[in-house]
Amino acid sequence: MEWSESVFDGRRREMVEGLRRSGIMNARVLEAFLEVRRHLFFPESEREHAYDDAAWPIGHGQTISQPYTVAYMTSLLADRVPSGKVLEVGTGSGYQSAILDAMGYRVFTIERVAALYSEALGRFRRFALPVAAKLGDGSEGWPEEAPFNAVLVTAAAPKEPEALLRQLSDNGCLVIPLGGMDVQQMTVITRRGEVFLKERYHEFAFVPLIGREGWEEEQEQS
């Protein structure tokens, strides 16, 4: 089968319909998934898998999350914070950043793996995406750019990083998978002054958040 842009367009429409059937109802999220060409965030030799509803390895022990997972997290954020500054922890391929940008957010993103950071930065420049990217420990956030209206963490942490909570604006929210190394519960923490309200949702399986306020690298390997 020849994977032309028209074929990818059709697969992308099918993906969005699948998300709708799976319960993703936020119209802005669905529109962004229809707009952003997910296959351009895959290596050319693997683009045929871009619209499968599955996570896919992108090297260095990291993955691009399955479309449903990205849409679910983005919906939790968008339902609470319709606009403003968003910090993404774990740039990966850059796809989640592109989705947030398509929805009109001002996006900041941090990646700890230098090779992935370089690849994502190249995509942002190639597609003229106004995303601010930084190489570093995402569990510590980006204090120089704080406060953020929302923080979205694309890796699993044993507990909510205090630094990320402190970088939220009032009424801002942190979307993060919390739990063990194998299974985590998607969690939304909303800031109300100095009070942080926690809501728990479905279970997922994410790669671990490595960093000062996440897992240690030795724990990841054990």
From Swiss-Prot:
GO cellular-component term (any): cytoplasm
Active site: S65
UniProt-listed GO biological process terms: methylation; protein modification process; protein repair
Gene3D superfamilies in the record: Vaccinia Virus protein VP39
Keyword S-adenosyl-L-methionine appears in the UniProt entry: yes
Keywords: Cytoplasm, Methyltransferase, S-adenosyl-L-methionine, Transferase
Annotated compartments: Cytoplasm
EC number: 2.1.1.77
Catalytic activity: [protein]-L-isoaspartate + S-adenosyl-L-methionine = [protein]-L-isoaspartate alpha-methyl ester + S-adenosyl-L-homocysteine
A Pfam family of this chain: PCMT
Major site of localization recorded for this protein: cytoplasm
EC class (word): transferase
InterPro entries, A to Z: PCMT (IPR000682), SAM-dependent_MTases_sf (IPR029063)
Gene Ontology molecular functions: protein-L-isoaspartate (D-aspartate) O-methyltransferase activity
Signal peptide: none
Taxonomy, superkingdom: Bacteria
PANTHER family linked to this entry: PROTEIN-L-ISOASPARTATE O-METHYLTRANSFERASE, PROTEIN-L-ISOASPARTATE(D-ASPARTATE) O-METHYLTRANSFERASE
NCBIfam families recorded: pimt, PRK00312.1
Function: Catalyzes the methyl esterification of L-isoaspartyl residues in peptides and proteins that result from spontaneous decomposition of normal L-aspartyl and L-asparaginyl residues. It plays a role in the repair and/or degradation of damaged proteins.
Family classification: Belongs to the methyltransferase superfamily. L-isoaspartyl/D-aspartyl protein methyltransferase family.
Protein name as it appears in the record: Protein-L-isoaspartate O-methyltransferase
Taxonomic source organism: Chlorobium luteolum (strain DSM 273 / BCRC 81028 / 2530) (Pelodictyon luteolum)
